[in-house]
Amino acid sequence: MTIKNSFLEYRMTELTQQIEKSTWHSKFAALGPGILMASAAVGGSHIIASTQSGAIYGWQLAIIIILANLFKYPFFRFGVQYTLDSGETLLQGYLRKGKLYIWIFFLLNVFATVINTAAVGLLCAAILTFVLPVQVPVPTLSFIVIGVSTSILLLGKYRLLDGLSKLIMIALTITTVSAVIIALARNGIQGVAPADYVSASPWNLAALGFIVALMGWMPAPIEISAINSMWVIAKRRVSKVSYQDGIWDFNVGYIGTAILALVFLALGALVQHGSSETVQLVGGKYIAQLINMYASTIGEWARGLIAFIAFMCMFGTTITVIDGYSRTNVESLRLILGKKESRPSYLNVAITFAALAGLAIIFYFNNAVGPMLKFAMIASFVSTPVFAYLNLSLVLKGEHRVKGKLLWLSLIGLMYLTSFTLLFIAQQAGWLN
């Protein structure tokens, strides 16, 4: 009994010390993985999906964005929570549940690596064509963007990635919020829409595909939870991060990106919704349209501001996509092969593969990027409930096991994600027609 009491007293003392060590200095020092997650999210869902939802439906889909971020919060948090608590990557946790899950994740992840690298590289290059004073072919610009991103990762490693992502997110947040404030001051909450304008309704089956695409990558695909887990491990190799500070970093990144999703919705709602111009749905054409709309509504000087916002979105996403997906590919393959550890050079090989494979798609299969990206989005959305459940199952035990309100939120979120997935499958199968 005495030994048991002594152990409990020791654990209480240890926990108290951990809490006391969590200072504002340690919190800011821990920032990194959460910011990287936010940087990966804004290019995938915000600059296109959020802004288009505002342009087409005004403020109506704000509730969907809020709910998607709210109900996905636990499952992204659990990836970080498991790693901080156990010292293992989320993929190691998947392996404990069964090797089949690692295989499924690996196959989906390799496909997503190639397609997402090509897609974000193309979009980033397309944005550059709007601001460069000379005409440069998009594939050439894609080569430059992906080449620069790869060089940063190969030469600077995690430390440079960590620091660069913070600068990108600070610049992106300031400029995006400034653009919305200027648009509000010029046009008011109604934006450019006439007073008697009747918005199209998103609450019908015809709009389900758009809503599913918005939700699927809002704030990011579910595999980002595994990627974020890898970034937590990388951060702990270069800096001491406590459990409390690691969760704080995650909350800053996740809540920040959720707020930015609404800010990007406002970009579309204030200058495009209700205008006479039909909203483009293709990524590159849509960003060109958005830039032109801001220039005509606010002033020609705003063209550079919106182009800068769009470029920072996509450049930050390009870097984090190549790094994050490469890390999870290396870790997945290590676990499949049963190796104890992987060499640092393996990550360099994976990064190079992601870059070259993405460029191959751009140069030789350019027309296939759209359909392949759509398939990647659908696969990500359909697999979300499975990996969300796995993430939850890994934090039901242990020192920081999930309980109370967070457990209830995760259960409601799991039902929410599963229901939408089944609804989407039913629509695609034609059962709702």
From Swiss-Prot:
Its main location: membrane. One of its GO terms (cellular component) is plasma membrane. It is found in: Cell membrane. The chain crosses the membrane at residues 28-48, 56-76, 102-122, 126-146, 164-184, 207-227, 250-270, 304-324, 345-365, 375-395, 406-426. It comes from the Bacteria. Keywords: Cell membrane, Membrane, Transmembrane, Transmembrane helix. It is a multi-pass membrane protein. This is Uncharacterized protein PM0681. It comes from Pasteurella multocida (strain Pm70).
